[in-house]
A protein has these predicted regions:
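Intrinsic disorder in cytosolic terminal tails and internal cytosolic loops
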Residues: 1-3, 454-467, 495-514
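12-transmembrane solute porter fold
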Residues: 6-22, 27-29, 225-233, 237, ...
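Extracellular/periplasmic helix-loop-helix junction of adjacent transmembrane segments
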Residues: 30-58, 292, 297-302
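Interfacial helix-cap and linker-helix signal at transmembrane-aqueous boundaries
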Residues: 34-35, 66-67, 152-160, 214, ...
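Helix-breaking motifs and short loop linkers at transmembrane-helix boundaries and internal kinks
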Residues: 39, 71, 92-98, 160-161, ...
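Central cavity-lining transmembrane alpha-helices of secondary-active solute carriers
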Residues: 50-64, 114-118, 304-316
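Helix-loop-helix hairpins in multi-pass membrane proteins, especially solute transporters
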Residues: 65-198
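Hydrophobic transmembrane-helix bundles of small-molecule transporters
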Residues: 136, 158-270, 276, 283, ...
Length: 514
């Protein structure tokens, strides 16, 4: 393949990844409008967001090995088709339940595409230096896409209805299909590699149980028995998955990969970077709109400061990692992200009273977001290189899937944990003025809706109390984010200082599990 053709292929797969990443966060700015139009309750709001990374995380391991079997070009193109169909269904969803289902279908297409994009890069760019740069661009697109999602959502909501945030995907999918069909190298894959669908179901059961338990545990009026049942389902799903993989001749995940500290550290760094990215953007876009009364577009543009820091740092990391190794970039990126999260909290107007930042100056948040984005760009690019650069060639599809699962688990955890903490602390700390309707305790959205029906004086008192309670949750979520990134920097620094183990022996032939 000629040099120009390789780089145009990189553009094509990067566009595919950009679509996937944008759809992870495009709803953040659309949530207030969507909630009002579809009458979604707080639980449905979180499921609308989480259905996408949840299904992706459950299917990615299977999608990687399926790509090894049928060919990564076929998986990429098939994923694009599914993504386009699901985007159309989501755009015209008539209810929260229908939108949750469409988001899950979107995730099926995304899960087919994501491992294929990275595997196509690895097989196309044979020169190590070029491959590291390509992986750097790929990794940066993932973070930039999540940062651009709120901007795109805000822009479209200024001119169209909320369904446009999904419908915009369709023409891009068509262009990527044409380019992918022309540029991507063919290959029939290896027909001797089976696809273990049951294992994907087991992972999905474990993830659904775990996420449900987290959300139930932070809900007012929680039922302990329900939480226990959800945790039992999660434990059973994950246990059955691990046992099945250890018996399989062709497992979805070779646990020997995790013995390499570089691969394990890359997985942890990728997950934590996405945890922080999703968490910061979720709570910040809500605060900018619901507390500071910014338009969706204005909120999205402010959050774009994250991408301003991420894009150049990711490209720089891609060009440096072959000389420095992943350790300084991963650890340095996580430490920088910690500082960025704390700086964002300190400079958020109205949150830290003694700094005296006036609420009419939202631009104060941008320095913290730039710093946080720069850290995530460093960490995620180095994490990609650590995983894909150290996995055996015959495990390319598996390694790509493991990396993508790390991203989705991080995003899923960020939304589930931080979103639940935000809502739970709001409900626990809101002190409504006497005579205020009880519905305002459910969420800040509900408080705003309730305030619209009150007199100006009552509305102001109610919103002051609601904003104060929301900021309690906002503060805690950013502190949790900073603490998680700091802990990750310590963990990866220690793991990456360990000696690299000898290559694991090839799998012995065993009877497939029944």
């Amino acid at each position: 393949m000629t040099s120009s053709r390789r780089w145009w292929l990189l553009v094509t797969v990067a566009v595919g990844l950009l679509l996937i990443s944008i759809d992870m966060t495009v709803l953040y700015t659309a949530l207030p409008t969507l909630t009002e139009d579809l009458h979604a309750d707080p639980s449905q709001k979180l499921w609308i967001i989480n259905a996408y990374p949840l299904v992706m995380a459950g299917l990615l391991l299977g999608a990687g090995t399926l790509g090894d079997r049928v060919g990564h070009k076929r998986m990429f193109l098939a994923g694009l088709v599914l993504f386009g169909i699901a985007s159309t269904a989501a755009a015209f969803a008539p209810s929260p339940t229908a939108l949750i289902g469409a988001r899950a279908f979107l995730a099926v297409g995304a899960a087919a595409m994501m491992p294929a994009t990275l595997s196509l890069i690895r097989t196309t760019f044979e020169d190590e230096h070029e491959r590291n740069i390509a992986i750097g661009v790929w990794g940066t697109m993932s973070v930039v896409g999540t940062a651009l999602g709120p901007i795109l959502g805000g822009f479209l909501l200024e001119h169209f209805w909320w369904g446009s945030v999904f419908l915009i995907n369709v023409p891009v999918v068509v262009l990527a299909l044409i380019a992918g069909a022309i540029l991507a190298p063919g290959g029939s894959g290896r027909s001797d590699k089976p696809w273990d669908f049951l294992a994907s179901v087991q992972v999905m059961a474990g993830l659904v149980g775990l996420v449900y338990a987290v959300k139930e545990a932070t809900r007012p009026g929680r039922e302990p028995l329900t939480i226990v049942i959800a945790l039992v389902v999660a434990a059973a799903g994950f246990t059955l998955f691990v046992r099945r993989q250890r018996r399989q001749t062709h497992p979805l995940i070779d646990f020997a990969l995790l013995r390499d500290p570089r691969i394990l550290s890359g997985m942890v760094a990728a997950a934590l970077a996405m945890f922080a990215t999703a968490g910061i953007q979720l709570v910040l876009t809500q605060r900018l709109q619901l507390v500071m009364d910014l338009t969706p577009l204005h909120a999205g543009l402010l959050v774009a400061a994250f991408a301003v820091g991420c894009l150049p740092s990711g490209i720089v990391a891609g060009s440096l990692v072959h000389r420095t190794g992943p350790r300084p970039l991963i650890v340095g990126g996580l430490v920088t992200g910690t500082a960025g999260a704390l700086l964002t909290l300190l400079l958020t107007p109205g949150v830290v009273p003694f700094l005296g930042i006036h609420p009419d100056h939202p631009l104060w948040i941008t320095p913290g977001l730039v710093v946080a984005g720069a850290g995530m760009g460093l960490a995620m690019t180095a994490a990609s290189a650590a995983i894909m650069g150290n996995a055996p060639a015959h495990r390319a599809g598996m390694a790509a899937s493991v990396e993508e699962v790390s991203y989705e688990l991080g995003s899923l955890s960020g939304v589930a944990v931080l979103g639940s903490v935000l809502g739970s602390l709001y409900t626990a700390t809101v002190h409504l003025p006497s005579g205020s309707p009880g519905a305002a305790t459910g969420s800040l959205d509900s408080a705003r809706t309730t305030a619209a029906e009150l007199s100006p004086r009552q509305a102001d008192s109610l919103l002051d109390a609601a904003h104060s309670a929301f900021d309690n949750g906002y503060t805690l979520t950013l502190l949790i984010t900073a603490a998680v990134l700091a802990a990750g920097s310590v963990f990866t620094a220690r793991r990456l200082s360990l000696p690299t183990p000898a290559p694991a022996p090839a799998y012995e032939e065993k009877e497939p599990a029944t």
